């Protein structure tokens, strides 16, 4: 309801919304009343023209989605059970301050959506989350990434400063350079994996045996002790396989240097990157663009493809950032977007991935954000508009207006002034 109104700049009739959303007018009117009374993010305006949403200052659909994640009983229920496996149903109802019958109805309804969309459910005897383990972990990577800011660390039993130190030292072992965003993502993935592993839930994936052995042999005693004290688990091969999954897959290269070396020695990597390079060069050629950091972009895209279902930023729970990013690119640079969309769909077939909108948008975001100097090039390639300024006061007034316009629009316009008395064409 809210997303439909947000994506439409015009007034929408209630009957039109009812048809689009497959929902009765009566229910929509009830929702409208509740939303306008209970939320301060927006006002849903009503008139004889229909309905229209008006967001309040510093509010948006994104802030609305974030508020839902914070306040929704359904998401609170999932989080409580994830962090407290085997909790009794009565304890959950007490924490949510709802009756047992209401809780059971909520779980029954929620399980239908969870099974259909994520291939797992909530079991109530006692409470636990069961199903496809990889999908369970990926869901909660994405959930905690979208719901909590870095400073709002939700895992109370794992000290954030200790977690930062552990992640920092693990990175140092592999000599991996990292930024704030990547560091935060690794923290979330590791802690989600810890909660599942602690409760005897395992994933079975290929791993880089050499890397596992390196970590076992090169982790010093002080760090090993800190890990075992923090997680209350023995630091051994199983711990590494379950906690550091997916970063120890054999297809993952932790530095661009490792990746470039693999192109020279690994036939499969060489073949894949050749196809990727061709796609990127085709996009650049079609749009009259240079691609100065092609090797870096190949490395990032290759990594994104293999880590896609382990990277929380590749999907979403409520707010689809990649979709809105791609939509904005389509609006601002339609020719580039068409090339990217076609190219990224082809890119997904190289990795045997489904050509989904979510996956394609994730690849588009990755390319646009990592392509060096892309936005300046696109603006330079735009046709410039010729502007002639004529003043009916004096020539210096025309020069002043030229300076004002140049300040606001920069190189987008070619501006001239004239003092001629003949303005006929």
Residue ranges of each PLM-predicted region?
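A cross-family "folded-core" feature that marks the main globular domain of proteins
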Residues: 1-425
């Amino acid at each position: 309801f809210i997303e439909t109104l947000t994506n439409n700049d015009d007034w929408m009739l209630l009957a039109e919304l009812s048809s689009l959303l497959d929902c009765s007018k009566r229910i929509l009117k009830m929702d409208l009343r509740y939303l306008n009374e209970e939320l301060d993010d927006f006002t849903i305006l009503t008139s004889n023209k229909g309905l229209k949403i008006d967001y309040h200052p510093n509010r948006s659909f994104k802030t609305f989605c974030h508020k839902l994640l914070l306040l929704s009983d359904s998401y609170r229920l999932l989080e409580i059970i994830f962090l407290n496996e085997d909790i009794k149903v009565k304890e959950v109802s007490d924490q949510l301050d709802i009756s047992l019958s209401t809780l059971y109805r909520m779980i029954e309804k929620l399980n239908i959506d969870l099974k259909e969309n994520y291939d797992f459910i909530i079991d109530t005897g006692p409470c636990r989350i069961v199903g496809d383990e990889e999908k369970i972990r990926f869901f909660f990577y994405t959930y905690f990434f979208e719901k909590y800011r870095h400073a709002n660390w939700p895992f109370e039993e794992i000290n954030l400063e200790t977690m930062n130190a552990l992640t920092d030292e693990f990175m140092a072992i592999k000599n991996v350079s990292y930024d704030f965003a990547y560091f935060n993502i690794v923290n979330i993935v590791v802690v989600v994996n810890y909660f599942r592993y602690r409760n005897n839930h395992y994933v079975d994936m290929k791993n880089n045996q050499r890397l596992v052995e390196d970590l076992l042999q090169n982790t010093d005693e002080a760090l090993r002790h800190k890990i075992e004290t923090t997680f209350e688990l023995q630091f051994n091969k199983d711990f590494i396989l379950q906690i550091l999954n997916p970063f120890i897959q054999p297809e993952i290269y932790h530095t661009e240097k490792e990746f470039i070396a693999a192109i020279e020695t690994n036939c499969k990597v060489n073949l894949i990157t050749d196809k990727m390079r061709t796609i990127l060069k085709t996009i650049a050629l079609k749009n009259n663009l240079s691609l100065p950091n092609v090797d870096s972009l190949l490395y990032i895209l290759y990594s994104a493809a293999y880590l896609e279902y382990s990277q929380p930023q590749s999907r979403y729970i409520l707010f689809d950032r990649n979709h809105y990013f791609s939509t904005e690119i389509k609006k601002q640079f339609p020719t580039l977007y068409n090339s990217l969309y076609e190219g990224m769909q082809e890119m997904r077939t190289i990795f045997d991935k489904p050509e989904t909108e979510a996956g394609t948008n994730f690849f588009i975001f990755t390319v646009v954000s990592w392509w060096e100097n892309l936005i300046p090039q696109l603006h330079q390639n735009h046709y410039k508009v010729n502007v002639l300024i004529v003043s009916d006061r004096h020539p210096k007034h025309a020069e002043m207006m030229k300076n004002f316009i140049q300040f606001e629009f920069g190189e987008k316009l070619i501006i001239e002034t004239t003092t001629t008395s003949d303005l006929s064409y």
